[in-house]
Amino acid sequence: METTARTIDRRMFLASGLGVAAATGLARSADAAEPSPMEKANMQIVKDFCAAWPSHDLEKILAFFPDNGAYRMTETMEPAKGREALTARIKTIINNVSQFEILDTWARGPMVVNERIDRFSNFQLKSWHGVGVFFVKDGKIVEWYDYTIASERA
């Protein structure tokens, strides 16, 4: 049996664990502290980012990332890192997105987690239900990782 070595850095490990935690419902409890002003700002950035997708405006969407931003479309894919790779990855679905419906959002410092249903038209999927983990720094999404809960084929 052939094995392959895979390097997992601390951030990827934490993002994976947080994605699983969010997917299983470990969000803010009813008696949790109110989000800080920074956390509220970070949640708003992610909300605005998700709201931008149905516009199909590539530059508007890319403006949420720094030049060295990263996006991993699913837990089984490698992240697209840097402006060129982000552009190429986003172009694969941008024109098919009809809605990102945010079901829940919470934040801890620079990390924002949302549960959402992404809806598509003229695409292999009708909808995708999952969890997004976003790391926000200086008003930009530096890393975005998505974790699948369920999907519905077209």
Predicted regions and their residues:
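A solvent-exposed, acidic/Ser-Thr-rich amphipathic alpha-helical stretch
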Residues: 59-108
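Short acidic-aromatic low-complexity motifs
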Residues: 43-64
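N-terminal secretory signal peptides
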Residues: 1-8, 22
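A short hydrophobic beta-strand element
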Residues: 109-118
